[in-house]
Amino acid sequence: EIEFQNDDREELQYSAAFTVQNPASKGRNQFVEKELRFLTTQYAEDHPQFGELCLATDADGEISYQEYWYRGGWSDSLETYWRNFTEQSTLKVRSYEEPGDRDHGTLCVRKTVPAGHSVRIRFILTWHYPNNYNYWAPEYQHIMWKNYYAVLFSNARESAAYGLANWDRLYGETKRFKDELYASSLPEAIIEAISATMSVIKTATVLRLEDGSIYGWEGLRKDAGSCEGTCTHVWNYAYVLPYLFPKLERSIRSLDYHYNQDENGRMQFRMLLPLGRP
């Protein structure tokens, strides 16, 4: 969310632009209403790398876009974009028929702000990569399951629409929690410890399986999880889930009793994926 404050004596025109690079090596970018979609043409819908991004806005100003930056050599694409943005009142449409290699696309909103007034422009970026699999165990890579958000939303456009429609509630509830935590009488060191460890549950350290159950790594490497299995010697000492989201904590215990306990009552300390794997 970007805010423009016009302190001039006359009305001014303001433009805000959001640029995204399509991560697909063979992809296409597509404008639909107030959205830019970043699609892949390389993979089938049941492939682990199939998916899309969606960049959207709910602004009521003048919307322009470039589905593609100029495909040139060296830094031609960036230089051409900057000239387009600074020298034109609105972006001129640029499209290519052939799929590209990680093309950039830009969504832009232009608004008139009266003297002494301000305006806010919202953008939201969502993704939808529905298929997950055990990439660290080759013998099980043929078994896939859905990420939980793929059960809730059928594509990135749906989650973008949800995010914009519920923006004020989601932001308000998050800010209220943050404000009350930092306004509490707890010692500063305790507040820091709570906030630092709490942030882990919104990272890729945590997965939600197809039924919504929680699965966690011990930590993360740059591009992979580190030490699988919601292991008990890490997650049994975590307090965020049981105190803030007890149903999610309970899902870990339910999985343990269903998949990790043997006929003698002994329980393994790692949950292996796919579920039910020996």
Predicted regions and their residues:
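Helix-terminus loop motifs that line ligand-binding clefts
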Residues: 236-278
